[in-house]
Amino acid sequence: MNETIDYNDQIIDSVPLDNLLPRIYEKMDSNITIHNYSESGDGNCQNFASAGDATGRGISSILTLDLLEDNFSFNADHILSNWATVYASGDVMLLAESAWNSWWFWGDEGIGNNEMTNIHAFDISSPGQTDYIASGRINGTIQDQFSLSEYNGNIRVCSTTGQWGRWWMEDPEPMVSHVSVLGLNSEGTVYEVIGHVGGIAEGEQIWSARFIGDIYLNKYIFQETLPLLLVHLTF
């Protein structure tokens, strides 16, 4: 068995990186040009980023194109991730993806990263270019792109934990919501939680959310009522 695994590992290691990545096909008249996603054809992967404990099997890519150029070219950055939710402000783009690659946690008493969300930030302030900034992780899962915000250099997120209704557990944690604020650490390499309000609206699910200036607004759906929650996020 070990010999088979070693043999398969050798085959995988010998495959060029570009053979494993998506490509862009440009057609001009009858000519087709293939563009690689890596920085160069020799398998350079410097424009790819991945969480140290990533479980995602896909690639989320940000492509920047100049539609006025005579010759087709693009700037690209990539995250190895699960299916991502995208948010963008004027200067920052966020990709938020589940830290776990499956929604099914049956029998998993040690939840671990199942309800965690990875958030990857990119600088889009320069036209025609994207630059990876850093990533962070928050507790809970998000509803949609309106659950995300970038404001004054910080990332703001509303999330929910326990919404999967773990019916197989005898006494599961109740469903609650959270508002988290993330800021870059002193080295500028990781987004860390610098503010958090948790335990919000026990037993209720986020229906919609908005961040407006220093204010976070949230609606929950519970039976036939729609309570509205406001949180002031000034530091």
Where do the PLM segments sit?
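Beta-sheet-rich non-transmembrane sensory/scaffold domains
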Residues: 1-235
